[in-house]
């Protein structure tokens, strides 16, 4: 008897082991393919939502794990914000190429959205450098808030 495209097995012991295996495996495989898999939600791995972890201001000074999680969350947020900014820039560039003679008027709304998002990104992540982490960003935010309390707002986004 040929199973799964393999030639028949001449060894009696292996044939017995395969028969025993198939008596257990066949009902399990049938149940999984006919009952479990059709009722499962198809959820791609790239749509995974991560839970929010405590921010750096909620961590204790000696809590290394909380610091690590806050930095990982900060890096994820920076990557998402950078990708949003890149998408807005690409939309503006596409509009500019498509509407070439009057792109200044037709793409103005995209330009305003991009500049607003760029300003918000720079307020949060600008001047941190390549090795900026959550604690440095928190200190930057704290110093900016102190400066604005003394001298007034720097931007329309921080009023």
From Swiss-Prot:
It comes from the Eukaryota. Its main location: mitochondrion. One of its GO terms (cellular component) is respiratory chain complex I. It is found in: Mitochondrion inner membrane. Keywords: Electron transport, Membrane, Mitochondrion, Mitochondrion inner membrane, Respiratory chain, Transport. Belongs to the complex I NDUFB10 subunit family. Complex I is composed of 45 different subunits. This is NADH dehydrogenase [ubiquinone] 1 beta subcomplex subunit 10. It comes from Bombyx mori (Silk moth).
